[in-house]
């Protein structure tokens, strides 16, 4: 583990060769607690507003006939761990670095995907149901995927899965979204106003999280170039593979966009927690910043994705044919199966 040449900071407390970990200052510690609390509250409010765009009937339709969710499951716990494994082997990174890349690939989808799904006119009902199900299934799928893919480098038993954090994430997602769904059911006009405000707040929140992460962990920015490259390729691969798999499965374009975002947008906060619980300070020197790098590039590529879609919309307008629920009621309706799930049948 000594093949990195990083100059030690003057205030480093843990050093090994030419590598070091700087202690967290009191200011950073206080700032971290305050901002974590504020961001958690803001995230709950944003998810409440996103729930205001979810219809109970359609949401339950995805649960009863979970074809879209099944595609998302294949992407989340099939494509992402495998992609992480391929990247780790291809770049020949250190074992501990390979494990962290795989931890990222095995994490469930992040809530930011719900916000972005709204901005790209995705299927919000599918987005929320996919995020909820992937977080719930992560309780079993994360240990399984880590066991399968990491055993060539480490004993998977040394990796600590924070089940309490996963449970907290699930509650923080389900409760505000459920309240939002109720508001949308009872007061649809008010829900539209809440949604508009929340969507703007959500965009600001995504940028704020990235900026805060950069401030809090600026002492760990010196990291091996290979991890920067992997952190760049990984989210883009997730978005692309998720989109193409959904399209191959016969999903309409707006659901392909949704599945793509749900696949590439990982829960980086959960990954950071697992890394901190599983590795010593000396080991963190080599890997601690990777979740932040992934977070930055997943947001950057999502922003590019959004920009391309907005430009396309301005040139061609919204294609109403891909949104069954807003078609003229005089036209012959699609089958309820296709309306709810898109199935595996082509358009």
From Swiss-Prot:
Biased composition (Basic and acidic residues): 323-335
Extracellular side: 1-29, 105-127, 180-196, 247-289
Protein topology in the membrane: Multi-pass membrane protein
PTM-bearing positions, type Phosphoserine: 336
Catalytic activity: taurocholate(out) + 2 Na(+)(out) = taurocholate(in) + 2 Na(+)(in); cholate(out) + 2 Na(+)(out) = cholate(in) + 2 Na(+)(in); taurochenodeoxycholate(out) + 2 Na(+)(out) = taurochenodeoxycholate(in) + 2 Na(+)(in); tauroursodeoxycholate(out) + 2 Na(+)(out) = tauroursodeoxycholate(in) + 2 Na(+)(in)
Cytoplasmic side: 51-83, 149-158, 218-225, 311-347
Keyword Transport: yes
Family (UniProt): Belongs to the bile acid:sodium symporter (BASS) (TC 2.A.28) family.
Known function: Plays a critical role in the sodium-dependent reabsorption of bile acids from the lumen of the small intestine. Transports various bile acids, unconjugated or conjugated, such as cholate and taurocholate. Also responsible for bile acid transport in the renal proximal tubules, a salvage mechanism that helps conserve bile acids. Works collaboratively with the Na(+)-taurocholate cotransporting polypeptide (NTCP), the organic solute transporter (OST), and the bile salt export pump (BSEP), to ensure efficacious biological recycling of bile acids during enterohepatic circulation.
Subunit structure as annotated in this protein's UniProt entry: Monomer and homodimer.
Name of the protein in question: Ileal sodium/bile acid cotransporter
Organism of this sequence: Oryctolagus cuniculus (Rabbit)
């Amino acid at each position: 583990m000594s093949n990195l040449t990083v100059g030690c900071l003057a205030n480093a407390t843990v050093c090994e060769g030419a590598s070091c970990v700087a202690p967290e200052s009191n200011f950073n510690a206080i700032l971290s607690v305050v901002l974590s609390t504020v961001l958690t509250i803001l995230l709950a409010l944003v998810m409440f507003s996103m729930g205001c765009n979810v219809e109970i009937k359609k949401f339950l339709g995805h649960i009863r006939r979970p074809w879209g969710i099944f595609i998302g499951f294949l992407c989340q716990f099939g494509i992402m761990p495998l992609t992480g494994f391929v990247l780790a082997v291809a770049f020949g990174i250190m074992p501990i670095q390979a494990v962290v890349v795989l931890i990222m690939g095995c994490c469930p989808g992040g809530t930011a995907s719900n916000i972005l799904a709204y901005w790209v006119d995705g299927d919000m009902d599918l987005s929320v149901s996919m995020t909820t199900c992937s977080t719930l299934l992560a309780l079993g799928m994360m240990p399984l995927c880590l066991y399968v893919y990491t055993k060539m480098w480490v004993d998977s038993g040394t990796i600590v899965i924070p089940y309490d954090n996963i449970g907290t994430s699930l509650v923080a997602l389900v409760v505000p979204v459920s309240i939002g769904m109720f508001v949308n059911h009872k007061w649809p006009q008010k829900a539209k106003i809440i949604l508009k405000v929340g969507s703007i707040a959500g965009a600001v929140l995504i940028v704020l999280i990235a900026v805060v992460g950069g401030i809090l962990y600026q002492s760990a920015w010196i990291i091996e170039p290979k991890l920067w490259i992997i952190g760049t390729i990984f989210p883009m691969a997730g978005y692309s593979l998720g989109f193409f798999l959904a399209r191959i499965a016969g999903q309409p374009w707006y659901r392909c966009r949704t599945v793509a975002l749900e696949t590439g947008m990982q829960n980086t906060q959960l990954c950071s927690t697992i890394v901190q619980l599983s590795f010593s300070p000396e080991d963190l020197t080599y890997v601690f910043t990777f979740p932040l790098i992934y977070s930055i590039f997943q947001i950057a590529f999502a922003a590019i994705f959004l920009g391309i879609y907005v430009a396309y919309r301005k040139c061609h307008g919204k294609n109403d044919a891909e949104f069954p629920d807003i078609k003229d009621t005089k036209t012959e309706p699609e089958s309820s199966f296709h309306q709810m799930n898109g199935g595996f049948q082509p358009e």
